[in-house]
Amino acid sequence: AAVLVQAAPAAGAQPAKADAVTAMSMKDLSAFVKDEIGFSYNGYFRSGWGASNNGSPKEWAIGSLGRFGNEYTSWFDLQLSQRVYNENGKTAKAVVMLDGNVGQSYASGWFGDNSSNDNLLQFSDIYLTTTGFLPFAPEAELWVGKHQLPKHEVQMLDWKTLPTDNGGGVGIENMALGSGKLDIALLRADIDQYDRTLSHSQQLNTNTVDVRYKAIPLWNNAELMVNGRYAMGNSTDEQKANVNDNGYYKWKDTWMFGTALTQKFNNGGFNEFSFLMANNSLASSFSRYTDSSPNTAFNGRYYGDHTNGTAIRLVSQGETYLTDNVIVANALVYSRGEDIYSYETGAHSDFTSYRAVIRPSYIWDKYNQSGVELAYFNQENKDQLGVKYKESGYKTTLYHAFKVDTSLLTSRPEIRFYGTYIHALNNELDNFSFADEKNDQFAAGVQAEVWW
C-alpha cells in the first residue's frame, strides 16, 4: 500500500475522485500497519440515563423480561490482543480482556468489590492462543490461560446458554473433524463450599471438561452443534471431614448436554433453536428467572442439598424481516425441572417457567427505527411440602433508535430513546417491589450501546 499525495487542483477541476483514491489508500495503509504489528483493540459498552415516575428507577427480572428500558448500569468489555509470533505457518497471540461495570446512579465511580458498590472490574481473560503447533491439527487453535470456549448468549435476556466457569485452563478450538469442527477445553474453577449456616466456607477445587462439536452442515444456511459439559470436585480429606462432621454441604458432580440448530435466512435474519438438559447445581441455574446462565455455584458460593434432580431448557432466539420495513426479534424460553435445589424454595423443588420477549420495529431508513418490546414471564415453584410459589410480570417498552444498519441484534452502535412500563404480577419468590412498595413502575431514558 502507498500514500498518494495530490497536488492542488487547477481552477474548475473536480478533486472528488482523487480525494476518494487518497482516502482509500490511507485505509489500505492503516489495515497493512495493523496487520504488520499484529495488535488489535476491541470492546463493548452500554451506558445511559434513566428516571422513573417515583424515585430512582429499578431493574427487575432482566433475564425474563428483557433488557430494553430495564437496565441502569454501564457494563463494559475491553480486549487487547498482540501477535507475538508469525513464522513458518505458526502463530502466537497474547490476549487480555477486562470487563466490569460502572454505576449510573452516583457521580463518583471508584471501583470496589463490596456488594453495595456498582463499580466493578476484573480480568475475565488472560491467555496465549496459537495455531500451527498441533501436528495432528495444524489449523486448530491451542490456547492456555484464563479463557473458555465461546459463549452463546440470549442477547435480549442478557444471559448465556453456554458459558463455562473458568479460573484457568487449556483448550483446542476449530479442529477439523468430519464435516464439522471440534472444540474441547479443560478448565479449573474453584468455588466457596459453604456450611449449613452459610457463615463458614472452604475453597473447593473443581475442574470441568467442556466439549462441543459444531458447524455441522444440515441444509442450506443451517448448521448444528452438540455440546457436553461435566464438572467434578476434587476434595481434600479435611474437606470431606467437614462435610461429614461439620455440616458443610456436599459437592455433587454436575453435567449438562444439549444441541443447537442455527438457521440463517436469505433476507439477512436468523434464528437459533437450542435444547439443554442438566442435573444438580447446573440444573439449579435453570430455575433462576434473573441471570439464568448455567453455573456450578451461585455467585461463586456452593450450597444446597443437590439430589441428582434434572432440568431442561428450550430456547428460540433470532430476528427476521417480515417486509423491507418491518423486522421482528424474539427470545422465547421454556424451562422445567424436577427434584432440583432451588435458591428460592430449597431442596426437592419442582419448577416450570415460560418467558417471551418480542421486539417488532419499523425501519424508517438505515439510521432510524421505531418499535416496541413486549415481554411476559410466568414461573411456578413447588417446594418439597407441595407449597406453590409464583413469580410473574410483564413489560412494555416504546422506543426510537438511531442506528447504523437495520438489524436489531447485530448492528451497533445504537442510541435508543425509550419509555417503559413494568408490572410485577406475582413476586412470591423474591418479594420484590419498586419504590414505596409499589408493584409497577414507569421509566423513561436514553441508552447508548456500542461494540467495535
Place the predicted regions along the sequence by residue:
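Transmembrane beta-strands of outer-membrane beta-barrel pores
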Residues: 47-53, 84, 98-104, 146-150, ...
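Short linear functional motifs in flexible/disordered or boundary regions
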Residues: 55, 92, 106-108, 140, ...
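Membrane-embedded beta-strand positions of outer-membrane beta-barrel proteins
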Residues: 41-45, 94-98, 142-144, 182-186, ...
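Surface-exposed coil loops of outer-membrane beta-barrel proteins
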Residues: 48-68, 107-124, 136-247, 293, ...
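Beta-barrel outer-membrane channel/assembly domains of diderm bacteria
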Residues: 3-137, 173-175, 319, 360-362, ...
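Hydrophobic secondary-structure block in the mid-to-C-terminal portion of proteins
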Residues: 10-13, 199-205, 376, 389
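Residues that define the transmembrane beta-barrel architecture of outer-membrane proteins
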Residues: 37, 51, 70-76, 119-124, ...
